[in-house]
Amino acid sequence: MVMIRQGMMKDCTDLLEVYQGTRWFYRTREGGYSTVEQVKYEHRGAAFERWGWLVAEEKGHVVGEIVFRTERTPSGGKIGIIRNLDVDVRNQKTAIGTRLTNAAESIMRDRKVVRVIATTPPAAYNYWMKVKYFARGSIANLTLPLSRLPENRTSKIKMLTLRNPNKLPNSMNFSHVAYPGSLAELAAQVVDRRLTGKLLEYYLKDRLIGVGVVAKQDDKTARFVVDVTKAGIGHSSAVISKTAKTATAWKVKSVVTSIPKDQMGMYSPLAKWSSEISTDIPVTRLL
């Protein structure tokens, strides 16, 4: 008999064995998982919501989990984001993944979510098709040497740096033109001090029109994500340029970002980016 319940930190002991099997999660830890503390680390931080953590328990052991959260949209509605779904390799194809997914959808439906998004590697694509998710677009990974990014000197738009936030700012829990979840995930890494970075807000006549996060990925590269409101669409070039250029303080050589491929039109007028289509697949379902 399998029971679906809210996750607890003590479950991480069992989840270590799950994580050491086949992990279908695009943010998988480099080098894998060898300690319970590493698993606990995945269940902390600014982007983690305790209400959005369910586990599947069978005969006193946790054999799977699903982690999810919600984001606001410009229309005032909400989308749901499945951050990960993992089932012990010995329990796959036993409907546990389906039960976890359905339970998560039920909670998100109660929270007025209208659409759910997950990011899946090709190996797990068939599972999402079976639970009535469908592929929607693709993800483009962009790279550009900082020296090739033109300076945007507009004085109309004011950039505000958020100093030492201790939680995810409301302005960053938002999806419009950025890939859903990407802004909040990178912002959380900065808030949690897992990466060195900056959280930025952009204003036009005291009205918030955009947000950006930039973080030092390694000695040569910084990663950034930007999003804009409906009123900020016409100023997206300034938001992109100012956010990416902030990385010059760390003396990195290039910047990278991942965006929905259909938003390339926002980036291509700025510079000639190196572009590569991600193997990860965005899938979605209307609730």
List each model region and its residues.
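Amide-forming acyltransferase catalytic core, primarily the GNAT-like/NAT-type
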Residues: L15, R27-H43, A47, E57, ...
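Hydrophobic alpha-helical core bundles mediating ligand binding, dimerization, or RNAP-core interactions
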Residues: L16-R23
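Conserved acetyl-CoA binding element of GNAT-fold acetyltransferases
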Residues: G76-V89, D219-G232
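Conserved acetyl-CoA-binding loop-helix of GNAT-fold acetyltransferases
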Residues: V87, K93-S106, K130, G232-A247
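Hydrophobic, ordered structural segments
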Residues: Q92, A104-E105, V113-F134
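Conserved GNAT acetyl-CoA-binding A-motif
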Residues: T101, M108-P121, A249-I259
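Active-site/acyl-donor-binding loops of N-acyltransferases
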Residues: N126, V131-R153, K253-L287
